[in-house]
Regions:
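Bacterial N-terminal signal peptides
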Residues: 8-20
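Conserved N-terminal structural module of periplasmic/extracytoplasmic solute-binding proteins
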Residues: 21-93, 107-111, 237, 262
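Short helix-initiation/N-cap motifs at beta->coil->alpha
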Residues: 61-70, 89, 157-163, 236-250
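Alpha-to-beta junction loops
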Residues: 75-86, 174-176, 250-258
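Hinge/lid segment of periplasmic solute-binding proteins
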Residues: 88-138, 160-163, 188-191
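Short, solvent-exposed loop/beta-turn-alpha elements that line the ligand-binding surface or hinge
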Residues: 101-115, 179-183, 199-220, 267-270
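Extracytoplasmic/periplasmic solute-binding protein
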Residues: 128-132, 137, 161-210, 217, ...
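Glycine-centered hinge/linker elements that transmit conformational signals in sensory
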Residues: 165-168, 207-237, 267
Length: 270
């Protein structure tokens, strides 16, 4: 089968309140996945504390690799955070186990979201978080390496074309054709979903909430992901997503998938 150029539109993040009793607490603890407290987030917290004298809010920045596990484990242990900036994919499980409270978004605010966005944080008739970020994934290409392999630097329009391009680079240059990750679940899942969504696959049927990972789309994607290991850097099981950017900058891989932030992390000549 042939598929269009790899590009996935993903709802990446959501914010939820953990534990209703903590809303009345004088001390509130929030976890922000991503490793940093952004000025805009701090400004909101500062304004909240100003509007609510006697309430103290502390925020903790945790890298994505460990953040969601930490939030979930705290909730399971009975010591949930008051709020957290996490991936929307975690909300269904947290809601099922009673670890988060539903949110009430006014109709006037619902109209601000694009169609389908709120579905990513909805489950059994309730909304469990505020969608915050919407990320597009793209295939970044090193034209120098691709042209060195004797090819035109044009985006592949199918998986067959992608593999053929990566294979030509690996066979005709000193670089790998494409960057692949598999060091741990978080890294592997994110990269795999990029390919799954581009193949028309999904994890959960939005209409029935049925798990659809046993679909033909998933099987095809698994087979292709495994095949890519033949043209990737050596030992993809040892690599994290963030390290692919370094490999790309060092011209050790000709292509890899990343979000739009990747463009600002590349060397100017690339």
């Amino acid at each position: 089968m042939k598929f269009t150029f790899i590009k996935s539109l993903l709802i990446a993040f959501a914010v939820s309140l953990f534990s209703s009793f903590q809303l009345m607490a004088t001390d509130m603890h929030g976890v922000m996945c991503g490793g940093e407290i952004r000025p805009a987030d701090q400004a909101v917290v500062d304004q909240f504390m100003s509007d609510n004298p006697g309430v103290n809010v502390t925020m903790e920045a945790v890298p994505w690799g460990t953040c969601q596990d930490k939030v979930i484990n705290l909730a399971i242990a009975g010591d949930p955070v008051s709020f957290s900036y996490v991936g929307s994919r975690t909300l269904k499980g947290l809601a099922e186990n009673g670890h988060i409270v539903a949110v009430d978004i006014p109709d006037s605010q619902k109209k601000m979201y694009q169609p389908g966005i709120l579905d990513t944080v909805s489950y059994k008739g309730n909304i469990w978080g505020y969608p915050h970020a919407f990320s597009t994934k793209a295939l970044f290409m090193n034209c120098g390496l691709i042209e060195q392999a004797g090819l035109a630097c044009e985006g592949p329009q199918s998986w067959d074309e992608l593999y053929s391009m990566a294979e030509s680079v690996k066979n005709n240059t000193g670089a790998a054709g494409i960057g692949l990750t598999g060091k741990d679940f978080d890294n592997t899942m994110h990269q795999f979903l990029n390919y799954l969504y581009s193949n028309g696959g999904q994890v959960i049927d939005p209409a029935t909430n049925a798990i659809t990972l046993d679909s033909p789309n998933t099987v095809e994607t698994l087979e292709f992901y495994a095949k890519l290991a033949n043209v990737s850097q050596e030992g993809p099981l040892a690599w994290e997503r963030s390290q692919l950017t370094e490999l790309f900058n060092d011209e050790q891989i000709a292509m890899y998938i990343n979000g739009p932030w990747g463009a600002g992390q590349h060397k100017e000549e690339l």
